[in-house]
């Protein structure tokens, strides 16, 4: 079995350290032959087997952060779309997979999974949606089979998927929204698996 090279992209946004610690912990517990590194170098991504894109804050800041690294978006497209290697987006990192986001204007995303990032309707609920909430798994036949339990969320915007088959799990907060999206080699969670104790580590695994 080939050694895994997992790269967590550092582009000035996202909880890089806790993501790295979670991956390192899984590698240790499960005794997986893998290295995990944090990098903003497209060359490093090219030589990786798995790529993780964390993200928090505003969509626009995150996508700009990626665009400002020369060659980064091209290499990501190459890695994910051309080579079809495993990719995992967390929180805003997952939202960046969409075609566009309506957060503070209209901003273009990576466009890997069809859909738009829209504001959660607040009505009577506190925003952001913050804290623990449960997920309902809609497709149990995949390599990733998360526990239907509580995960840690912090967000005010959600991924409105065009195709229902891209929704692996949903969560309710005023409305049902996708808490895990997927397409072929691409997975994304709206919640923070690195802050979701053991069940979060399960997903990372």
Locations of regions flagged by a protein language model:
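C-terminal and late-domain segments of enzyme folds
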Residues: 158-205
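Pocket-forming structural segment of enzyme catalytic cores
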Residues: 71-74, 99-173
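N-terminal beta1-alpha1 cap of cysteine-dependent amidohydrolase-like domains
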Residues: 1-87, 92, 114-118, 124, ...
